[in-house]
Design a protein with these regions (language model features):
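RNA substrate-binding interface of SAM-dependent RNA methyltransferases
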Residues: 1-52, 115-123
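Residue-level detector of alpha-helix boundaries and kinks
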Residues: 15-22, 77, 98, 102
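A short acidic, often aromatic-flanked loop/helix-cap motif at beta-alpha or helix-coil junctions
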Residues: 31-35, 55-56, 102-105
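Short, well-ordered alpha-helix to beta-strand connector turns
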Residues: 44, 71-72, 92-93
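N-terminal hydrophobic or amphipathic segments with adjacent small-residue motifs
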Residues: 45, 73-77, 107
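Long, charge-patterned amphipathic alpha-helical coiled-coil/hairpin "stalk" segments used as oligomerization
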Residues: 53-87, 98
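Structured adenosyl-cofactor binding patch, chiefly the S-adenosyl-L-methionine
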Residues: 82-124
Length: 124
């Protein structure tokens, strides 16, 4: 997927996407990603999984915004339409509260969930 947007037709068709993907790194697992980010930022990132359910270590958007304001490196973990693998929730430091809406149904397309979460965390 990344190669499509970095070389050939994809890169020509959408050069700004190519530019955005220049900072992308493909990692094998969460531990490798945490090691890389720890080396890069000099501090272990706080890992925050996302999903459609609450967990015992769930935190709200306001709490996470507070951590971000402290300048802590934070690694947000998003899954596919099927969610994250169970072990990721166990390994993560926190799980972000699910995106709530009207009623009990809260399953969103991943793109939509990411957009809503980022807006709630970094919008002014």
């Amino acid at each position: 997927l990344i190669e499509h947007w970095m070389t050939g037709y994809g890169a020509e068709y959408n050069p700004t996407r190519k530019e955005a993907l220049l900072v992308t790194r493909v990692m094998s697992n969460l531990a490798e990603t945490v090691r890389y980010l720890t080396e890069r930022y000099g501090k272990k990132p706080v890992t925050v999984a996302t999903g459609a359910r609450k967990f015992s270590k769930s935190v709200g958007f306001q709490y996470l915004r507070g951590e971000m304001k402290k300048g802590e490196p934070i690694l947000l973990l998003f899954g596919t339409g099927w969610g994250l693998e169970k072990s990721i929730f166990e390994e993560a430091d926190y799980v972000l509260d699910p995106v709530g809406g009207v009623g009990k149904y809260n399953h969103l397309p991943v793109r939509a969930a990411i957009a809503i979460i980022l807006d709630r965390l970094i919008a002014r």
